[in-house]
Swiss-Prot record:
This is ATP synthase subunit a. Belongs to the ATPase A chain family. It comes from the Bacteria. The chain crosses the membrane at residues 38-58, 100-120, 146-166, 220-240, 242-262. Its main location: membrane. NCBIfam families: ATP_synt_6_or_A, PRK05815.1-1. GO terms for cellular component: plasma membrane; proton-transporting ATP synthase complex. It holds the Pfam family ATP-synt_A. InterPro entries: ATP_syn_F0_a_bact/chloroplast, ATP_synth_F0_asu, ATP_synth_F0_asu_AS, F0_ATP_A_sf. GO terms for molecular function: proton-transporting ATP synthase activity, rotational mechanism. It is found in: Cell inner membrane.
Length: 271
């Protein structure tokens, strides 16, 4: 619910501010007077992404330790369904041989899903706790709505793409792929390099921006509903949007995982 001393514009702007650390002075940034510098760190995005990553590890480790060949419990059944789903996706999409791809795909899917799931929390709950209990000037709780997080994950995928390309094709084969495709003639090397370079760089950029754009839009809609409507009428739009958003957060986690598998499969193909 919007604070009584805030206009709707102030309320929306307040919820779109990250809790930032100025890396030059190691002090918290005033969201109303941010410094004109690149050297800031979004502490809230880092904190929640790390916590959710640890939660993923603890959940799966707990199930692995308690796994039984008998009748599984509900939680174990849910985890097994997720693992089976990811394993089937990797089997269908990845055509190379690597023991890394399935664990990587599982980590990406569950981690991104958990980060997206934070969008379903009441919009004012954690920011209110952060402000009134810990004295934080701002707090955003959806890591995947921060372009720094999504592009960082995409950068990790890009490094793996380069690694598998060089591993499977060698430096020479990878260089030929960039310079002799699609036109197999030395005269077209500059053109090929531009085309293939743009194609290669567009993969991580589109991967990160797609997830960020969808989650930022979803977060913004929740903020608009909470900031512009009276509290007693918010549920009329919030409930249907939250139900629809469950599909979106799951789909976006799957798309990020699926594209990662496809890109790594393409990188692993020998020409």
């Amino acid at each position: 619910m919007a604070s009584e001393n805030m206009t709707p514009q102030d309320y929306i702007g307040h919820h779109l501010n990250n809790l930032q650390l100025d890396l030059r002075t190691f002090s918290l940034v005033d969201p109303h007077n941010p410094p004109a510098t690149f050297w800031t760190l979004n502490i809230d995005s880092m904190f929640f992404s790390v916590v959710l990553g640890l939660l993923f590890l603890l959940m799966f480790r707990s199930v692995a330790k308690k796994a039984t060949s008998g009748v599984p419990g509900k939680f174990q059944t849910a985890i097994e369904l997720v693992i089976g789903f990811v394993h089937g996706s990797v089997k269908d999409m990845y055509h190379g041989k690597s023991k890394l791809i399935a664990p990587l795909a599982l980590t990406i899917f569950v981690w991104v899903f958990l980060m997206n799931l934070m969008d379903l929390l009441p919009i004012d709950l954690l920011p209110y706790i952060g402000e009134h209990i810990f004295g934080l000037p701002a707090l955003r709780v959806v890591p995947s709505a921060d372009v720094n997080i999504t592009l960082s994950m995409a950068l990790g995928v890009f490094i793996l793409i380069l690694f598998y390309s060089i591993k499977m094709k060698g430096i020479g084969g990878f260089t030929k792929e960039l310079t002799l495709q699609p036109f197999n003639h030395w005269a077209f090397i500059p053109v090929n390099l531009i085309l293939e370079g743009v194609s290669l760089l567009s993969k991580p950029v589109s991967l990160g921006l797609r997830l960020f754009g969808n989650m930022y839009a979803g977060e913004l809609i929740f903020i608009l509903i909470a900031g512009l409507l009276p509290w007693w009428s918010q549920w009329i739009l919030n409930v249907p949007w939250a139900i629809f958003h469950i599909l979106i957060i799951t789909l976006q986690a799957f798309i990020f995982m699926g594209l990662t598998i496809v890109y790594l499969s393409m990188a692993s193909e020998e020409h």
